[in-house]
Amino acid sequence: MMQIKVFCMVVLCAFLFIACEKDNDDYEPIKPPVEQPEEPVKPEKPDEPEKPEKPTTPPATDDIINVKIGDSNMIVGSNNWNAITYGNGKYVAVGEKGYVTMSTNGVDWSTPKQVGSKVWHAITYANGKFVAVGGSGYSGQKAFVTYSTNGIEWATPVSIPSLYGDLCSITFGNGKFVAVGYHEYGGREYRYVSTSTDGVTWTSAIKIGEDTGTQLMSVAFGNGKFVAIGDGYATTSENGISWSSLTRISYDSFYSIIYAKDKFIICGSNTVIYTSTDIITFEQRFAKPGTSSLISLLYDNGCIVALRKNGYYLLSSDGINWSEPAQITDESGKVVTAMLNGVCAMP
């Protein structure tokens, strides 16, 4: 039995731990048949019909590790936290009004400090640095980036050249950081990307396509490609600079993308989940029309977690078969009503 711990970022500045259990982790890839030499005197036997593959069972959702939401040491600051990441033995969370906080154990957190005064939307750890991206949340004002090597001391935020909007997501791959977002101008929205090899110096924003009212909400790297998504569209790049035309996948809004189990996994409104192995063909794997949006995805230790903003989560071991949405509860069994913003794996 394999178990991973997951750390959820809550809008109301509380924190939750949940564990996801993968019951069937011993599946082996199907081995190709080995041809045998024909016997000279015996007639050939007819081919046997192929046997259907054993269906994959989604991970169990009955092993929840709960904490008391009201514990004073789990209330951090007085502003909303938007994103969290883990790196170099530390958890770092970022949020509204430029605030950041750090913890080495997920329980005891540093006093929140302001790094600039903007909204930090996303953070990642790669290449020896924590790098956070965000903006003002208002049209006509620039997007910003900051970085830290220890999660405590932060560089003065710098603006992204030519980008008057917000950066919503950041990833690292192929030797560079890639951040995506949008630029509002004259009441129109344009999709933009900026890249950096060191997290310090950033390229001028690159526009992707023309105005379609589409924002780029999330970006991931896998199988040699960057893939950015938003508002039901996807675009791809091998170098983070030249991007494909926007492809319509769905009329649902998209909020998060990851690469796991040899495929890209996308989630969004109406609890929708799509997968693709080639970024050409996309298959819908889950949906519940009229329900809350899935806003974050996580892959760790063989388990995939999809998180709803309203406190529900889904689990999968392959990205194809998913458990039914389950509610996060506190240690007394009461449903958690705080709104969630993100999720992070714990070692």
Stretches found by the model and what they are:
Residues 5-6, 24, 78:
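Generic extreme N-terminus detector
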Residues 2, 28, 39-42, 48-51, ...:
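Short, low-complexity interaction segments enriched in Ser/Thr/Pro/Gly
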Residues 14-69:
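Bacterial Sec-dependent N-terminal signal peptides
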Residues 1-18:
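Sec-dependent bacterial lipoprotein signal peptides
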Residues 59-347:
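Residue-level hotspots at or immediately adjacent to binding/recognition sites across diverse folds
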